[in-house]
Amino acid sequence: METLRLPWFRRIPVLFLAIGLLPTVIFGADSQRKPFTVRDSIALTKVLDFNTSDGEQAPGLFSPDRSHLVILTRRGDLARNVNVETLLLFDAREIQTYLSSANVKPEPHAKELVAVSAHQPWDGISHVSWLNNQDICFTAKLDSDFAQAFSINIADGKRTQLTHSTSGVLSFAVAANKVVYYTLASATNSRPRDVGWRSFGELIEPDGSAAHGSPLVELFVKSTNGEQSRRIDMPVSRLSQTFQRIWIAPTGNYAISFRPAASWSSDWADYKIPHYELFGYSPDKMAGGDYTSPEVQNRTQYQLIDLRNGAAKPLLNAPSGFLAQNYTPAVVFWPSDGKSVIVSDTFLPLDTGDQQTNHQRQLGPAIAEIDLASGKVTEITPEPYITPETDRGSAALEHIVSIEWDAKENLLTVRKQQRGKELSSQAFHKVDGAWRQEPGRAEEAVSKQEVTVSREEGLNERPKLYAKGLSCGCRKLLYDPNPQSDQFNFGHAEIFDWTDANSNSWHGGLIYPISYVKGRKYPLVVQTHGFNADEFLIDGPDGYTTAFAAQPLANSGFLVLQIGDSRQAMTLDEHEGERYAEGFHAGIEKLISEGLADPAKIGLISFSRTGWHTLYLLKKYPDLLAAVTMADAGLIGYVADILSVNSPKDFKMQFSKVVGGIQKPGDWMEKSAMYQLSAIETPVRLEANDPGSAVATWEMYSLLRSANRAVDFVYFPQGNHILFSPENRLGSQGGNVDWFRFWLQNYEDPDPAKAEQYARWRELKKQQAANAVTDHAR
């Protein structure tokens, strides 16, 4: 289950105009523009984010001397069923000249450095970093069967392959003529194997998403001059993508990475981990020294690697701060003397001998400096930590968004943000071996940046990159990834708030159909799984491309409600499903009461965790929805439970807890809403994106089909939880536009390629009608 990320937003007032008693087009479609479809969404170019050295997500990376800027784009090519990822280079001098001129056209030219056609997410360009001012490094699947690390010279385009792994490079770092990289522990083969701790998904699809999500890895080091790779003395370990990070010291002697916390000292139980019964470092969660156990999936600690001899050991007798859930980015910096390292997002050892200091360290992670020779820990500053109030959502958490290091000045700048407030900054300066806060110096790093680049977008503003100049105080468009979008119609979006029967507050975005007419009721499709008030919603929240299709639906005459998450409703127990169901219901009822939504034409798309919430909605309000989709959904049933036998204990505990505790298999039938839907009349579309999901989803499909309910099951055998390939996206997103148009608008696309789909659905409609007669006669 994913970590909850809850966006918050500002209410935007809306002015409605009316002329007499005539229906008024409020958000009119431009007759010169074209409808926006799923195919158009797939073809859009997206600017992807980089992980920067200060921990922020940024749309561009400047070279160390800030003379050049790179961005990474992705667009779908449906004809070839690939995503084309391209690394583009800008000259910062051209940007400065452009900013200082009176002209707004043309924008600075972008030079293509490399383009990759990716069939899967792990085939594309990733882990981009500057080696120096002239060379950029990245991983990609180019001329071999597996992804490798490369460098490319920005002047002549010469590309150098840095690794030759026989199982694929998962992540890497390069500095001081050293390359350190993670690989899959073994190449795929067809020989018999011990199941061990492998998940069901890994077992039946060893090259699929499950294997890449939390794989068994090994760590290697080699020199950039072609030296043979040497394996780091670290056991084969289960390490998710989040923790496949590496930081090499400028001297080339050391590196920092993460390692699984497979065992720990008894005092780790004293760290105040939110939802302790699930995620705390209690003795029963220990993996007994097994680095491949699923128990270590989210339990890690920093490790120090001696690159001279390959030895690796824990940097601290303390866990990383990941499970503290305070959103601090994990960053590592190397002071210029090479004798210590600075790390963020880590708990600190409870061995100070001072009760008050130990208590403070128990509360949350910190940023600290560690002496490499002695292991001495010097706390620079504690990090914000979760309290009961922030956990409930009744108080806002001020979280760290970036941490910057100026090695010349020995200056560490920490930037924080709290909901509804501007960034705040603190600067910490090291003088004569001691750290002290220095007010007034926090803006030094920003003041040295002559040019900055940022992505700007909003509810009704599509994303573009803008450059800003410090000296001129100016701002201009740098890169429009989709100028062709000006030819499309997009539904107008607004903030939409409501309160449910439990007095929980909900927030979301409402997208009106194009050519919306005030006073007319429209079919409504609800999309779940989050909402961002500063996002131009095309598909789903955060760009999710499984099932969600907000703008194509709005262009097909639907009102679309994108529902945000609720801290008050996400209780991680048996109340969560019902609370989310009440939130969904209240949002729908408000739109009906305001005369916007047609009560007979309500549809809903759930995905992942919200699939389980939707089961409760169907159970409590069986007549609410005219059609529903549950895409790669967490359905929380007996089959899914037995498939998760090799999952971490905390995951299995969550699984049981959300239905009120499971003591024996029969409890599932009594407590899970899935087994209480055999009489529903709502047509159900199920989607599964990999073999493991298909087996779990088959249970609900079987239950509904056996009860002669209207159920459709679409399977994407080489899919991803968030669908990646253009063909899969068209099948899922386009299929859902067709699904809701069929059930809510009685419309069938005349495309001959879809004839079988509609023949299948017409049979479901007959079955639904027959069920209605039979059910009402009882």
Report residues per predicted region.
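The conserved beta1-alpha1 loop
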Residues: 277, 528-529, 688
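Non-catalytic accessory segments flanking enzyme active sites
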Residues: 58-61, 68, 73, 254-259, ...
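Active-site-proximal cap/loop segments of hydrolase catalytic domains
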Residues: 541, 546-556, 560-778
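Short beta-strand-to-loop junctions in surface cap/lid or active-site-entrance loops
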Residues: 508-520, 672-674, 678
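Short beta-strand element of the alpha/beta-hydrolase
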Residues: 520-530
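N-terminal secretory signal peptides that target proteins for export/translocation
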Residues: 1-10
